[in-house]
Amino acid sequence: MLKERLENVRGTNPLIHNITNYVTVNDCANILLACGASPIMADDIGEVEEITSICRGLNINIGTLNENTIESMLKAGKMANKLKHPVILDPVGVGASKLRRQTALKLLEEVKFTVIRGNISEIKVLALGQGITKGVDADVNDKVKDDTLDNVINFAKGFSKKTGAVIAITGAIDIIANESKAYVVRNGNPNMSKITGTGCMLSAMTAAYISANVDSPLEATLASVCAMGICGELAYNRLSKRDGNSSYRNYIIDEVFNLDGDKLDDAARYESY
């Protein structure tokens, strides 16, 4: 099942419009190229609608907001909806400031998202309209564990029903859900959290997967999350004694580039609920 999702990305080479943060924009572009898609980064109000119209999907990331990019996100999102293009929201650090919360909630009100991807703290803030995050990281009290898994799955399904979006809660244990079905993914490596941008890269890559698999956004998101986790594992195994987090980031991108469908199917560790 996952193999087909990856092969569809490689076979169609979807052009993805990214309105993302300037911390990880280069990594997002490279991960899109590595997975078989093509990136374009455009956030000026004067061109976002035009750029969105020539793309297959839209990735919105609120990591470094300003007044201009907020308006650009709304314009691009509405244009993508008009054209029935998939749209993903990455609510980076949504609980860290009033501006982020207000922006994310306004986006949810005015744009229909195909996927919403974030850590558990970010998704809770979106769903509840309040709360805090540890900067852009999940609060330790929110971590998804086996003894809280059922509650988080039900929470994700409920939020999916409310928004109409696939909800991807990522961390040590990943949960991908729509209102009726969920997948729990156990791929990845803890050291991925030591790299700034693995979540942003995952959102960009997920935009490619859902754009190449428009009829199956849940399974496309599952494939993307599994792919990123597997590549995190493979990249970690390549590290030498003197390699650090910069080398690890580059190896992850390399592994995404080299990942094939058979490897994805064989190495993916997930259960359905």
Swiss-Prot record:
Name the family.
Belongs to the Thz kinase family.
Q: Which branch of life, at top level?
A: Bacteria
Q: What is this protein called?
A: Hydroxyethylthiazole kinase
State the needed cofactors, names only.
Mg(2+)
- Function according to Swiss-Prot or TrEMBL: Catalyzes the phosphorylation of the hydroxyl group of 4-methyl-5-beta-hydroxyethylthiazole (THZ).
Residues involved in ATP binding = R117, T170
What reaction(s) does this enzyme catalyze?
A: 5-(2-hydroxyethyl)-4-methylthiazole + ATP = 4-methyl-5-(2-phosphooxyethyl)-thiazole + ADP + H(+)
E.C. number: 2.7.1.50
State any single GO MF term: hydroxyethylthiazole kinase activity
> What's the source species for this entry?
Clostridium acetobutylicum (strain ATCC 824 / DSM 792 / JCM 1419 / IAM 19013 / LMG 5710 / NBRC 13948 / NRRL B-527 / VKM B-1787 / 2291 / W)
Q: What does the UniProt keyword field contain?
A: ATP-binding, Kinase, Magnesium, Metal-binding, Nucleotide-binding, Thiamine biosynthesis, Transferase
Q: In which pathway does it act?
A: Cofactor biosynthesis; thiamine diphosphate biosynthesis; 4-methyl-5-(2-phosphoethyl)-thiazole from 5-(2-hydroxyethyl)-4-methylthiazole: step 1/1
Primary gene name: thiM
User: What Pfam families does the record point to?
Assistant: HK (PF02110)
Task: Name the Gene Ontology biological process terms.
Answer: thiamine biosynthetic process; thiamine diphosphate biosynthetic process
Binding of substrate: at which residues? M41, G197
